[in-house]
């Protein structure tokens, strides 16, 4: 019997990332775990619908035995079974992030006995989670370089706080892993601004695009009007295509916050990314830790190692026989496997 791994959910940033990473790694390695103080660092600690959906999805995909899988629970015991490929559908029942549920179960399906399709309904444009377009346009091309083949499709938008969106991913088992090297992003090739609107006046998008264009030379400026019943909602994105990587940054509009202020938040984030030579932004760095660890080698550079990133690395090192190295030089941190 494999040893039980004990995790403290209050570790590091004290959010849901510890639980999501632990579920992924437990399914992959077969190691059971217990976690206490789940989301202790959040205003509403314990399992919310999004986290409970991730637990139930993991349980179904590998036939796990679970204790503590209920709303508000701050303790969970998870004993994984065998990961099975197949066609899965999960509903969050709120505007909780579809992509974070997918992030939990897809790594296990890289090791399944056949191809899979996972469909999740809930929130797609959530201020605290990467949107589907980020997964599709930024993360998945990098996963393909590592040898991981999955394809995400946004079937319907669901803005926070209403939800109602649907995201699906098709994934194949990994034949072999390759090493990812992302030391520098290289010169910028082009930048693209995009605004999504649902049940929001078009002039909001025009003002947001104008704010972006006032700070950056945009190769493309796109405004997409979605059906009113998918809103109300508004998301502003800016994609930075460089020689070695494409990064994408986003901000979700809020009620009683002007279009100019919303877009200015995005401008600030992109300028911070461009101020260094680092290849990877803060959100993407979080996503690369697990696939890189599974490959057993690789590196990337990031300007600002987040608490999320450090917490994720700590959890990965509990389950896998790898050690990460973080070396800071001239404001850029090189993250690699020793």
Swiss-Prot record:
Result for mutant: residue 134 to A: 3% of wild-type RNA cyclase activity and 2% of wild-type RtcA adenylation
One cellular component term (GO) for this entry is:
cytoplasm
Record note on what altering residue 130 to G does: 33% of wild-type RNA cyclase activity and 13% of wild-type RtcA adenylation
Under PROSITE patterns, the record lists: RTC
- Stated consequence of mutating residue 250 to A: 28% of wild-type RNA cyclase activity and 38% of wild-type RtcA adenylation
**Pfam families, alphabetically?**
RTC, RTC_insert
Biological role stated in the UniProt entry: Catalyzes the conversion of 3'-phosphate to a 2',3'-cyclic phosphodiester at the end of RNA. The mechanism of action of the enzyme occurs in 3 steps: (A) adenylation of the enzyme by ATP; (B) transfer of adenylate to an RNA-N3'P to produce RNA-N3'PP5'A; (C) and attack of the adjacent 2'-hydroxyl on the 3'-phosphorus in the diester linkage to produce the cyclic end product. Likely functions in some aspects of cellular RNA processing.
Q: What is the protein's name according to its record?
A: RNA 3'-terminal phosphate cyclase
Origin species, per record, is: Escherichia coli (strain K12)
